[in-house]
């Protein structure tokens, strides 16, 4: 049995995380900290401070043997614990093996077409993903990875051979913007973009459109230049920034207008992108 990894959430049926109905799996932990993260509770592991335990109105949380425990049956899903946590974590994490998680996924068949792993950053657990994907492929389920692209996919060829593709976030193209948004540079993201495209594993390139926090037009141009002649077969998703769930310095940042989104879409199509999704 594989090692147990922290699982933040499992959504049995999703229509926005790849083609068809899919099971979306969110693993806990992230190696960057985006200013616009709308799931900040997936970033870090619990430090057992106990603040959520004291705040829980349903008394569904407790500290046992030095760890926070969660009673799913008692939980009223009010998210008070998420709002209380100052450490960008969640007490509702489950530690599961690939086999245990696959048993849950299999229960959703035949109503799903595949699974999509996300986070946090799911590529922090490549061996777990490899084992999970092998199990899923064995029963005919497709497998997609939703990644921030800061971990080198070239080091995980076996995992990539099992995956149908990677939905890759391109948060910014210029490193100054990238550092401002995430605290790190985008060198590995650009490398992964090129290699995934060449290998036929780039399921989708994703660009968040913000007002004043990145240069999405520059990112779209950078993606087009990198994929080159494959631009016409590269799916591009332009995602409008929304402040829901965001904490910190971008909590009250404005969303781009419809006109701005339409303008970037036109530029993308002028660059040769055919499938451009605006969301």
Regions found by a protein language model. Give the residues of each.
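Short Cys/His-rich Zn2+-coordinating modules
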Residues: 10-20, 36-38, 65-68
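Cysteine-centered iron-sulfur cluster-binding motifs in ferredoxin-type domains/subunits
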Residues: 26-59, 67-88, 121
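Auxiliary Fe-S-binding modules of radical SAM enzymes
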Residues: 1-19, 209-279
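Fe-S ferredoxin-like electron-transfer domains
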Residues: 52, 61, 66, 90-112
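Conserved AdoMet/S-adenosylmethionine-binding subsite of the radical SAM
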Residues: 99-252
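Non-ligating segments of multi-cofactor redox enzymes
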Residues: 1-16, 27-28, 49-50, 54, ...
